[in-house]
C-alpha cells in the first residue's frame, strides 16, 4: 500500500513539529516553506528543546497543550507527544494530510535516526497513517547554519516527493548539505549510512567537588561509501532516504528458526 501521489499540495492540511522546540529558528523556516505549498499550516511542537529524545512518549504525567498564537501550539512533552496530540487532539476535527518535521539544526544521518526527535516526529505521523517527511540542515562548526539552503531547496524536494508518493510504512528523511544553495550538487536517493562509534564521555566536577558527566554528541562519519546519506551530504548533495520502522531482519529471522 502506498500514499497516493499529490500533484497539487495547495489543498493539504500540513502539521509541523520538531525536536528543537517551538521557538527554534528551524521551525520558523519550515513554516515559511510549508506556506509555499499550502495555506492550511498548523504547528504543534515541544515547548522546550527535545534533541535526541528519540521516539519517546510521555505516559507517567499529564501533558499541557498551550496555544501560542493562531494555529501554533506548544506541548510540554516530546516530539512524539506533539505529533500525537496534534493529530488526535488539536486537529481531531480534520486531521492533517502531511506531517513535516524540522528543520533540525544539524544533520540526522546514519545511526542519528535512532536518537533523533526530528525523525521520531515523522515516524509518529507515519504510524498514524499520514505521509511524513523529516528535514535537517547539516551544520559543521563553527559555520553558521545555512538556513537559506534548506529554504531554497526544500519546497521543490517536498513537491517532488508528494507527486511520486511512497509506501505507507515509510517515512522520508531529508538532509541538506552545509553549503550555500547555489553550491548544492543535486538531489540523491540514498540509503542510511553508518557513523563510526564515538564513546566520548566528558567528566567534570561541580563546585562541591562532586563528579558529573556529559555524553559527547560528536561521532566520526564514514564518508567513503557511495550511495549513503553521509557520503552524499558531505559531497554537497541533498540526501533523500526512505526509512521503514519495521526493524525485523528477515535473513536472521530464518537463520534463528533452527535454534528453537
Curated annotation (Swiss-Prot):
Predominant place of localization: cytoplasm
EC number: 3.1.3.5
Signal sequence region: none
GO-annotated cellular components: cytoplasm
Record GO terms (molecular function): 3'-nucleotidase activity; 5'-nucleotidase activity; exopolyphosphatase activity; metal ion binding; nucleotide binding
Keyword Cytoplasm annotated: yes
Cofactor: a divalent metal cation
Residues the record lists as binding a divalent metal cation: 19-20, 51, 104
Domain of life: Bacteria
Keywords assigned: Cytoplasm, Hydrolase, Metal-binding, Nucleotide-binding
UniProt-listed InterPro entries: SurE, SurE-like_Pase/nucleotidase, SurE-like_sf
HAMAP family, sorted: SurE
Membership in a protein family: Belongs to the SurE nucleotidase family.
Name the UniProt record assigns to this protein: 5'-nucleotidase SurE
Gene (name only): surE
